């Protein structure tokens, strides 16, 4: 009995390391994609896919899930860059024992031989979040605002205010699964309009992730000697983190914390609560109070 806690910690340490390796592989995949994409852009958000459940079922498809997902665009990545759905599943995830086909929504044929999307991954954002944008002002100490869906909690202004601006309405509709039109995905491939001071480097623009974007991310706009943020400081994907277990899994890892992939490809484990985005109380509140997809 004395050994059980130690064994549990050892198992979790191994799962955490495997989880970090998955994120590192995703970092390589994103870099490979960017090297071949127009403007060296990283993949956009998953968005609205053509396999809406009703349509997919009528064409003989199984496991075609609804929801835009806070993950990368699977049509762009599969199968040329991402070939193994297990890379998207953290071993510490509370649904890890679920078959991968169900857990991340790997589309299968129902036996009719008519499904056109066999093998595609319909819900890539269940374990690791990926937004496709550069958020550089979400650390603790940066400006916060009341959550648009729960004014009782404070969340990062750069994210919350930006998503609620009318100029970003189409992107917001896709993020919140309010759109059923795949044509709206074009909004996710554009930069977002931000309120004054909320944009990257204090501008009015939230840029899509692309190689070289760090040059636009000034660490301190009030300091004439302020330098650009390095890729090693820009978080691009991370373990699930939420303040609300009823809507979403709170953490993949116990004790609470997240593996975080940075744009240069390295991964760090940050224990919650941390002062650095995304393992902050304000970000956990933002995600935990979003409408469940």
Residue ranges and their predicted role:
Residues 26, 79, 185, 189, ...:
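Intrinsically disordered, low-complexity regions
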Residues 213-293:
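C-terminal accessory segments of extracellular proteins
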Residues 126, 133-240:
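Acidic, glycine-rich loop-and-strand cores that form catalytic or ligand-binding grooves
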Residues 102-103, 144-174, 261-293:
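Contiguous hydrophobic segments
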Residues 21-22, 35, 45, 63-66, ...:
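Detector for Asparagine
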Residues 1-162:
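Hydrophobic alpha-helical segments and their capping/adjacent flexible loops
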